[in-house]
Amino acid sequence: MTSRQEGASSHGSRRSSRHVGSFIIDREIGKGSFAQVYMGWHKESKAAVAIKSVELERLNKKLKENLYGEIQILKTLRHPHIVALHDCVESSTHINLIMEYCELGDLSLFIKKRDKLITHPATHDMARKYPSAPNSGLHEVVIRHFLKQLSSALEFLRAKNYVHRDVKPQNLLLLPSQAFREERALPIMEASQDSLIPISGLASLPMLKLADFGFARVLPSTSLADTLCGSPLYMAPEILRYERYDAKADLWSVGTVLYEMITGRPPFRARNHVELLRKIEAAEDVIKFPREVSVTPDLKALVRSLLKRSPVERLSFENFFAHHVVTGDILGLVEDDIPKPPKRELETIRQGEALPSSPRVQMARQLSSDPRDTRSSPKSPRSSPRSSTVNSSADAAPRRQSQNAERRLSISSHNSGQGLGIQRPAPPIQSHTAPNHPRAADRSGREPQPSSLRVARQPSDVSLTEEEKAAQDVMFERDYVVVERRHVEVNALADELAANEKLGQNNSSAKSSPLQRRYTQQGSATSTTGAIPTPASRTALVAQGRAGQDRRSSYEKALSASPGSASSAISKAIQDASLRLFGYKVNTMRQKGSSPPLYQPFPAYPTPTSAGLLSDGKGSQVSDEDAKAAQAIEEFATRSDCVYGFAEVKYKQLLPMAPSMDYGLGGVSPDKGTSEEDGLTVDATVALSEEALVLYVKSLTLLARAMDIASLWWSKKTRAESSVVSQTLVQRINAVVQWVRQRFNEVLEKSEVVRLKLTEAQKLLPEDHPSNPAHQGEDSIASSAVGAKQVYLTPGISAEKLMYDRALEMSRAAAIDEVTNENLPGCEISYLTAIRMLEAVLDSDDEATARNISSGKEIAKDATQEGSDLDTEEAAHVRKMITMITGRLNMVRKKQQMIAEANNQAKHVSAMRRLSGDVTPRSVPSYGST
């Protein structure tokens, strides 16, 4: 034991104690984004455990909620193929999860080291009997074995309405076979008597356990979630599209894991989730396997049925659990793994039990069935082979199953976790639900298998380039991506407004129209979520992924419909200021193709006449409220556009080659690096990335404010609180909302690119550098407004300070031009842009302002300044600056008006002279007769 303690990692040696409760911390065996995993030992029994130690200081509020949620979930789960939680010990600085120790590591390492499995004692026999084919993945016997155990764990989770949301090879841990563990003198702490005994698959092969429930949550089969989380390479496309999703997202992840076990690599590889979605959409549900892969067609068909872009077309849980690949015998077994049917088991089979006719009836029945009936069904495709394949000895199989089958299938909480400090709730009535329950033997009609002749094998590049391997390793190290509900709300509201733009027509029948009745079923008017969930939205969700579905508004962004927007006032101001500050202009010319523009200015919409806004005069008060809401939305959009233009200056310096026409959305070519091309030092890259990131986040905040106001306004209108609304005004607001949605998605994608650029550059900084993440505290995380992704910023970096300095520079340069009477139109543009930036500095994320605006209350001049992060003196100074710049702006406009009037007067005089015939030049002498 002393030698084990001396072998502890340096990080462990810095901890105040080597003891955690009744356990001793040993060497470090793994490391994640927020936790270290150590091997540990129970003080008395000397049994091995895994200790997941999480440092509380590195977690923000969202991550702490995930951690405590993981603890609560693991306390209630007891299943042989789910990593069990033994104990939880919390201190002032750490939370230590004492969990089952899985000696062989995770499945991703198992796949990557498949050629060396024969050299490991625990996997030598497996690699000898079932070797991996060259340029391929694992042997099909091993694949089916792991699939059975994974499906067993997922079936148990579905019975409890859990969705894991992060199924990936890194979260599938492996144990040596039971026979190998018994030969070695390394005891492993068991959560229960059967927690280390597999209930499916082969007993001679390693045992798989599902781990890491940090993103898991209760999600009934009829519910939808809207938080984007999981690992990028294994995320379902509906999550990547920021759509609501259900538990079937886990089935996509299962398909990706299966594909990786078959081929040795993920089905889709990308640098970020935006590029990943593009590749998934481009594949169009055509999943190709390399020619070197030698697996049966039914296994390939199962993978293809799981990797369907549309959740509606994807294989259901019922059909997945009943699939013959999951329930049937494993083919190709050799030596002792060949099943030997027990003789005495035929005597205990019941023959009169009726089988369910549909998967739904079957699931409902299993949740309320007796456990004895569950395990003794005569035609269970999974229980029958289990009796002969789980234990290699034919004599031991019937005896072990007759003693432990009911306990295994019930996963009873009564016998698990005793004496380990875990208080577990009493099991519900349906807790005996078997993870592997009987099913009908004949399901050929329900599971049609495509002919293998129809699958055209395409040649594929087997050998991965070094760049692909590096990108794949980077994605393996990237634990997860979390995008909150706001992204779903923005797109949902924009789709709803676009679909119902003609709200203002037929105002007389607005209250009785079908459209109005449909929307009266929404939530309360005081909802603060911003998105209005409607049946129409869910109907649209069902149609996702079908042929003809157009999502260009969300991802392949159409260019602005505003004519001449590339030469708009704000664009010109940003270019002029960039020329003064950095020596070059930001190019705003549009390129052809679907790649989003580098800078798409906010379109200038034609202002409708007052008569159009006031309708027939009867609803003047309501129309005035609507006009105020529209004006507020446009003001927030304009401020956001100013901040976005400033961020684009930083982005252009950071990624001069991106986004290109070929690699839009802020991406770069996979075979071209940027560290050598851009010529920036590491310090400059970090500084530019930090500045661009905080500016993008500020722009997103302003866009979200605009959508909040639009959402509240739309909610009021759809509830018929006001039946008078101008169609012109609805079109005006809808146009702004569509622009905001387009810009929101674009900024979100670019901010992710900048974030990745920042984190990669920070890794290259010296340890003593002030911007090194090791020197950053929690304040620097929160200041980025994206703390869920653990982005560390240098102290002092803020969007408000950058915007204030930029506005000051632009106003000073404009003042010089004003004094010399040079470029007065440019002065006006610069003053306007500076005012908008300073207004954005004063703006805060206060939803009360949005409610006041949408409810028609009078908007104070500085309403958006309440709740600002600035102190009183700073806010007063910024307001004073706005007043001064506004005064200069008025002076410039007066000068322009005077010049315009003088020019018009001169033109008028010239025209009058031409009409009177006085066209003789006065400078030409007249020669008369003398």
Curated annotation (Swiss-Prot):
Highest taxon, organism lineage: Eukaryota
Composition-biased stretches (Low complexity): 377-393
Gene Ontology, cellular component aspect: Atg1/ULK1 kinase complex; autophagosome membrane; cytosol; phagophore; phagophore assembly site membrane; vacuole-isolation membrane contact site
GO terms classed as biological process: autophagy of mitochondrion; cellular response to nitrogen starvation; cellular response to potassium ion starvation; piecemeal microautophagy of the nucleus; protein localization to phagophore assembly site; protein transport; regulation of autophagy; reticulophagy
Database matches in CDD domains: STKc_ATG1_ULK_like
Compartment(s) where it occurs, according to its Swiss-Prot or TrEMBL record: Cytoplasm; Preautophagosomal structure membrane
Record bears the keyword Cytoplasm: yes
The protein's name: Serine/threonine-protein kinase ATG1
